[in-house]
Amino acid sequence: MHDIRLIRENAEAFDAALARRGVGPVAQSILSLDSRRREIATRMQEVQARRNEASKAIGAAMGKGDKDTAEALKAEVAALKVELPALEEEERQLTAQQNAALAAYPNTPAADVPEGADEADNVEVSRWGTPRDFAFAPKEHADLGPALGLDFETGALISGARFTFLKGQMARLHRALAQFMLDRQTGENGYMECIPPLLVKDEAVFGTGQLPKFAEDLFRTTDGRWLIPTAEVSLTNAVQGQILGEAQLPLRMTALTPCFRSEAGAAGRDTRGFIRQHQFEKVELVSITRPEDSESEHERMTQCAEGILQALGLPYRKVLLCTGDMGFTARKTYDLEVWLPGQGAYREISSCSNCGDFQARRMNARYRPEGAKGTEFVHTLNGSGLAVGRTLVAVLENYQQEDGSVAVPEVLLPYMGGLARLTPQG
């Protein structure tokens, strides 16, 4: 949600910032609503003050025996009592319209975000690792996985397209990856482990920006709750409506949860394999910070995600998203794209975003600086640390052997109960 005060102070700058994201100009329409709402609010105050004044004057007139004046004042008070509810209703409607307008447009991009229309305009920042030189033609995970326990047919039989059934050694590897990620993020990177709800209310999904614009991408239950598309929703909303102390910041949280997405906008994309699923697991990272700390926290969070890929020995590249490819709530986003030799391409495995105070305004999440009387909105950040299923895909493709087996990365061996290789016989 945007700050109406900033729009009042510099409408041109607001329109220019949104224009970088292909939106606008919208400032004048928002300010028109704001002006009318403020006029009505002022009139309400005037009516309330005059009603109180006239009510007192009635008693004074009656005390003097001036019945004519008293009756005139009574008539005026009666008229004001009729006018006031109408003004209150108009003010309520205008406030709702203004808030809807402030919530309808995406976050304004940071100054160093490159302009562009789509992913083709993203800017590569760095690369890590050298893709393995295979002595054979590497397979895609969709071809390699079924013999190792990645069962697409059973998943489709039970639940339909974009569901997968993991069995035996494959399920063990998936669990090992998730546990390793959690251990690294909590033990070395200082994130507090959480187990949040998977079902959330409208207010929570609005707070993190999925509602109202992206409802079709979500699953809704019959009682009106939503299955989380990411633990970002639950973790970020943990500070909804709160005023935190400065000493509580930064607040760093992590959670391993199932995530549920309808993939309404992904028809025809990644229909084979384990890349794009309706249900998948992810280790999410969320940070709540002071405004002046969010940029450095963004770099730190991204490094925490990169550390998982480095520990697993998976080549990847870091990409700065352009204005046309960023998510709705982000002011700056880094994507980490892992090398998949079977596809011969880098594919997204983590997205780390600084949302500034955009989500905090929607959630009314604040903090009180030490020694200050007033409060300020916090800044919120989120990132994948990592998507477990896509990391599984990357391990399968990068560690595959010519005989169809897959070597287990060294850092995962303590989690595998002595299993050092996935084999078709296993």
Curated annotation (Swiss-Prot):
Gene3D superfamilies noted in UniProt: Bira Bifunctional Protein, Domain 2, Serine-tRNA synthetase, tRNA binding domain
Q: Name a GO molecular-function annotation.
A: ATP binding
List where in the cell it is found. Cytoplasm
Write the Enzyme Commission number(s) for this entry. 6.1.1.11
Keywords, in A-Z order: Aminoacyl-tRNA synthetase, ATP-binding, Cytoplasm, Ligase, Nucleotide-binding, Protein biosynthesis
Q: What's its catalytic activity?
A: tRNA(Ser) + L-serine + ATP = L-seryl-tRNA(Ser) + AMP + diphosphate + H(+); tRNA(Sec) + L-serine + ATP = L-seryl-tRNA(Sec) + AMP + diphosphate + H(+)
CDD domains from the xrefs?
Answer: SerRS_core (cd00770)
Gene Ontology biological process terms from the UniProt entry: selenocysteine biosynthetic process; seryl-tRNA aminoacylation
TM segment ranges: none
- The reply to whether Chaperone figures as a keyword in the UniProt entry is no
Similarity remark: Belongs to the class-II aminoacyl-tRNA synthetase family. Type-1 seryl-tRNA synthetase subfamily.
**Partners and quaternary state?**
Homodimer. The tRNA molecule binds across the dimer.
Q: What is this protein called?
A: Serine--tRNA ligase
Q: Which organism is it from?
A: Novosphingobium aromaticivorans (strain ATCC 700278 / DSM 12444 / CCUG 56034 / CIP 105152 / NBRC 16084 / F199)
List the taxonomic lineage: Bacteria, Pseudomonadati, Pseudomonadota, Alphaproteobacteria, Sphingomonadales
